[in-house]
Amino acid sequence: MTEMLKGIAASDGVAVAKAYLLVQPDLSFETVTVEDTSAEEARLDAALKASQDELSIIREKAVETLGEEAAAVFDAHLMVLADPEMISQIKETIRAKQTNAEAGLKEVTDMFITIFEGMEDNPYMQERAADIRDVAKRVLAHLLGAKLPNPATIDEESIVIAHDLTPSDTAQLNKQFVKAFVTNIGGRTSHSAIMARTLEIAAVLGTNDITSRVKDGDIVAVNGITGEVIINPTDEQVAEFKAAGEAYAKQKAEWALLKDAKTVTADGKHFELAANIGTPKDVEGVNANGAEAVGLYRTEFLYMDSQDFPTEDEQYEAYKAVLEGMNGKPVVVRTMDIGGDKELPYLDLPKEMNPFLGFRALRISISETGNAMFRTQIRALLRASVHGQLRIMFPMVALLKEFRAAKAIFDEEKANLKAEGVAVSDDIQVGIMIEIPAAAMLADQFAKEVDFFSIGTNDLIQYTMAADRMNEQVSYLYQPYNPSILRLINNVIKAAHAEGKWVGMCGEMAGDQKAVPLLVEMGLDEFSMSATSILRTRSLMKKLDTAKMQEYANRALTECSTMEEVLELSKEYVNVD
C-alpha cells in the first residue's frame, strides 16, 4: 500500500530505492552474581579496548569522507571510553556487588546519563549524556558478543531507514550505494543532517514513525529538497521522483560550469564565496568547487589530532600547505578554539558546569595557561605568511581588552621574528569572530581597531536565543531568521562598513539559500560555507537583483516580529526551494 509522509528536508537530493532498515541488536542481559570479579574487570577492559579500536577506525574513515570538523564528534566518544573516573566506578561496582561486567557498566553509565540529562539548563552536559549512551551501547555489544548495525556493509542501492542515525552510523555510509536516509527523529542541525550534506546524500528527518511503516525491501521515494517521502510509490510517482532527481542532477551539472566564474549578482555586484576547512587535505575540495578564498580554517584540529602540543614547525608546515594550496587566494585562519566540546588530553583544564560559556578559545590563549601555546601558534602563522595571503582571526571575543591583548602578542611575536631575521609578511589582516552578542552590540567600537569581522552564526544564534541547536527539546528556538538575529547581523555589517572594514560569515547561515538574498542586501562581503554549497550559492547570487532585494531586507528588519513572518515574506521576493 502506498503511504506518503512529510518530514524535515535536511539534505538536498532525490532518490528511489529499496529500504534498508537499520535494526539495533537485542542488548538485554541478566544480572549475575560472580565470584571472580577480576575476570569481569578483564572482560570490561577487553570490551573498552575493542570499542576504542573500532571508533578509531570509524573516525579515520570519517576524516577521509567527511573532513576533520564532522569527525570531531568521535573525539568526545573516545574521551568517554578513556574516562578514568567512569571506568573506576564501573570496576568498583563490579567488585562491591560481585556482579557481571554488563550490570556494572549499565548501572554506572545509567547514573551518569540520568545526572547529565537532569541538567536541563546545561546543553553541554545533555550532549555528554548522548555521548555516554552511544559509547555504553557499543561497549555492551562487545560484552554480549552482539554486532551493532554496520551501514558500511550495504552493497546495493538503498535508502537507509532508522529511528535515528548516530554519528558513527552516518560516517560509515557509502554514498556509492546509500542514496538517501530517512529517520523518525532529528532536524536540519543534527549531526546526521550536517554529515549528509557533506556527503551529498539526500536526507529527510523527523518523520516520527517511518520505522514502523516500512519493511526491508520496500521501495521508498525520498525528496530531500521538499521533505516528501513515499513508501511503495505508484509507477507514476516513481516517474515523478525520478524526473525530479534528473532535474536536480542537471541543475548540479549547470552549477559545475560556474566553478571558475566570479560571484556577481544580476546587477553587477561582486561578493566573495569562501570555504570552511579543518585540515590541509580539505584544500583540494575547496579548489574543486571554485572557492574564491578559505573563509575559516579551524586550527584546533591540529591540536586534537596530536598526542602533545603541536610544535611551531609542525604548525608552520600545515599553514604553509594551505596557503600554497590556495595559490594566493585569501586564507582566514582562526586561532585555536579549544574548550567547550573540544578537549585536549594533554591540556589540563578545570572541570566546568558549562564549558561553552567558560574557559575556552581566546580566553585560554591570552591566559597564563595558554600563553606559550598561543605564542607558538602565532609564530608559526607569521612564518607561513610569506607563502600566501594570510588573514588571522580570534574566536570567542567579548571584550575589546581581549582583542587588544591578543593583538599585542601578535605584534610582539612579529617583532621577535623580524629581529631573528625571519621573513614575515607586512600585509596580514587581523580580525575577530562575532559570535557573542556583547561583541555584536559593540561592533562600532571593535570596528575602529580590527581589520575585519567574521560572523559565526552557529554560536551567535545559540547565545542570543539561549538555546543549544543540538538539543532537540529546545531546537525550535534555534532560529536563523528570527528578526533579533537579523538585526544583530545588520548592526555588525553597518558598523564595520562605517569604518571601511569588510565582514564575512562562516556559520551555516552563510550557505543557507533562503538567507543569502537577505545577507546580500545587508551588504555581507564574504560568505564562507562547506565547499559543496559554493556552486549552488554562486548560481543563486547570479540571479539576484540587489536593488529588488532592498525592499525585502528593509521589511524583514522593520516589519517582521517572528521567524515565520520573515519566511513568509521571503516567498514574495525570492524563489528558493
UniProtKB/Swiss-Prot annotation:
Cofactor: Mg(2+)
Binding site for Mg(2+): E435, D459
Amino acids binding phosphoenolpyruvate: R298, R334, N458, D459, R469
Gene3D superfamilies, alphabetized: Phosphoenolpyruvate-binding domains (3.20.20.60), Phosphohistidine domain (3.50.30.10), PtsI, HPr-binding domain (1.10.274.10)
Active site per the UniProt annotation: H191, C506
UniProt-annotated location(s): Cytoplasm
Superkingdom field: Bacteria
Enzyme Commission number: 2.7.3.9
Top EC class, one word: transferase
Cited InterPro entries: PEP-util_enz_mobile_dom (IPR008279), PEP-utilizing_PTS_enzyme (IPR050499), PEP_util_AS (IPR018274), PEP_util_C (IPR000121), PEP_util_CS (IPR023151), Phosphohistidine_dom_sf (IPR036637), PTS_EI (IPR024692), PTS_EI-like (IPR006318)
Listed GO MF terms: kinase activity; metal ion binding; phosphoenolpyruvate-protein phosphotransferase activity
Bridged cysteine pairs (disulfide): none
Induction of the gene: Transcription of ptsI appears to be regulated in response to sugars supplied, i.e. is four-fold lower when cells were grown on lactose than when grown on glucose.
GO biological processes: phosphoenolpyruvate-dependent sugar phosphotransferase system
Secretion signal, residue range per the UniProt entry: none
GO CC annotation terms, alphabetical: cytoplasm
Key words, A-Z: Cytoplasm, Kinase, Magnesium, Metal-binding, Phosphotransferase system, Sugar transport, Transferase, Transport
Catalyzed reactions per annotation: L-histidyl-[protein] + phosphoenolpyruvate = N(pros)-phospho-L-histidyl-[protein] + pyruvate
Function: General (non sugar-specific) component of the phosphoenolpyruvate-dependent sugar phosphotransferase system (sugar PTS). This major carbohydrate active-transport system catalyzes the phosphorylation of incoming sugar substrates concomitantly with their translocation across the cell membrane. Enzyme I transfers the phosphoryl group from phosphoenolpyruvate (PEP) to the phosphoryl carrier protein (HPr).
Subunit architecture: Homodimer.
Record's comment describing the protein's domains: The N-terminal domain contains the HPr binding site, the central domain the pyrophosphate/phosphate carrier histidine, and the C-terminal domain the pyruvate binding site.
Similarity section: Belongs to the PEP-utilizing enzyme family.
Misc note: The reaction takes place in three steps, mediated by a phosphocarrier histidine residue located on the surface of the central domain. The two first partial reactions are catalyzed at an active site located on the N-terminal domain, and the third partial reaction is catalyzed at an active site located on the C-terminal domain. For catalytic turnover, the central domain swivels from the concave surface of the N-terminal domain to that of the C-terminal domain.
Official protein name in the record: Phosphoenolpyruvate-protein phosphotransferase
Native source species: Streptococcus equinus
